């Protein structure tokens, strides 16, 4: 459709649609070939108050519902993407509107959850019922957290979702000082057992990703490892600079490597929200570096509130 004058941004940015009296297509089959990156999409983040207010005024909901997400999914598809991490500051993609996940499946969008939302659960699902679930601490609250994780897998077992594994602290924070690689390896082991039990398939047959975001990369550098089928998701420094790339030995990891990249960031030591701080030249250079080092299984772009 873009070749006949329909911009991917025709709805979001009111991009004019070129009108034709007739459209002609040559006989035969034409293809651009497979995309260079298998899973590629966006992360809606830092969405309040701008996007949340706009959704309330446009769609009449206090959450991102399927009518809103259908527009986002269409944009992703028109931009040749196939994946998304949904907004999570105050919304819960799965719980707020059960038709959200159904719409993603119908439109061919592969869903995931962010680096601190394991096992297909949105953080708000925990935060809204903190009294029921108890402390976000695997050392002291293992049974409740395993139940929380299991419920997420029960809901996602018949989807194409990519399951985030591992665990960070409560609400996009580092884990407590007592956390160590042995605890995190135990968490991953138990999560994969839940995946196996719920799906009735070997865990290796269910796509999973481990995000080496912020302090989690330190665990990896200290020697923590996950099974060979898991996608290893490297990250930038939140301002568009790649922190590390896999060496020659690491590039043999069968699960492949991914990149989580920011053009929007809210956090210490400074925000980059609403600031055009990521130059296209820098982004091109850094992502070319990413691809050249074999990071081509999954790319996710944090676009803020879109």
Predicted regions, residues:
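General beta-strand structural signal in soluble alpha/beta enzymes
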Residues: 44, 85-86, 111-113, 165, ...
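Catalytic or ion-translocation cores adjacent to nucleophile or general acid/base/metal-coordination motifs
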Residues: 94-136, 144-149, 284-293, 303-306
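Structured mid-domain segments that build the active-site/substrate or prosthetic-cofactor binding neighborhood
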Residues: 77, 82-85, 91-92, 99, ...
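Gly/Pro-rich turn-and-neighbor structural signature
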Residues: 14-26, 88-89, 95-106, 130-254
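Solvent-exposed alpha-helical segments and adjacent loops
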Residues: 1-53, 57-78, 91, 170, ...
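A generic structural motif
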Residues: 7-15, 113-120, 203-212, 235, ...
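N-terminal accessory/precursor segments of enzymes
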Residues: 1, 35-51, 55-62, 69, ...
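The substrate-binding groove and active-site-proximal loops of carbohydrate-active enzymes
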Residues: 1, 45-66, 81-92, 126-145, ...
